[in-house]
Swiss-Prot record:
Belongs to the WD repeat Groucho/TLE family. Residues 175-197 have a biased composition (Basic and acidic residues). The keyword Protein biosynthesis does not apply. This is TLE family member 5. Residues 166-197 are annotated as: CCN domain. It comes from Homo sapiens (Human). One of its GO terms (molecular function) is transcription corepressor activity. Pfam families: TLE_N. It is found in: Nucleus. Homooligomer and heterooligomer with other family members. Binds TCF7. Binds the NF-kappa-B subunit RELA. Interacts with PHF12. Interacts (via Q domain) with SIX3. Interacts with SIX6.
Amino acid sequence: MMFPQSRHSGSSHLPQQLKFTTSDSCDRIKDEFQLLQAQYHSLKLECDKLASEKSEMQRHYVMYYEMSYGLNIEMHKQAEIVKRLNGICAQVLPYLSQEHQQQVLGAIERAKQVTAPELNSIIRQQLQAHQLSQLQALALPLTPLPVGLQPPSLPAVSAGTGLLSLSALGSQAHLSKEDKNGHDGDTHQEDDGEKSD
């Protein structure tokens, strides 16, 4: 009689233990699923961010490629112009007197020796002229741009020098206008003084 009772008691504890293990396993699976879901969400956000950065890089690449292609074409064009001008100089040179020939040859050699500071100065002047022409076309006042802000569609050689140059030009124009107004005021005062005499 004792054996069946012990057997019955053992069998009654087994479903409870099995039920507890199944519930625990389900909880673990649920926790792991939530963890994987969080990792998936994080990876998806990172993937979207990388895709956005990739499209931005591709856009910059296309822009720089077009700029590089345009500069390459312009360089070949300028090289061809220089070649033709050298040919014209070589044809005209024999018709000059010996003294003038030496002067022209010296001037040509000096023209070929362009230094980096001279190039930077030339590029800066061209950039200033281009910016001023754009500002005049847009009918905007000559005020310096905020630091770090570049005009659209302008290839900047140096952001700092371009902005400082534009700022300097704006202040010079403003000062010259004030000087002119002050001079006109002095002229009117002198005229009034003469009339009073």
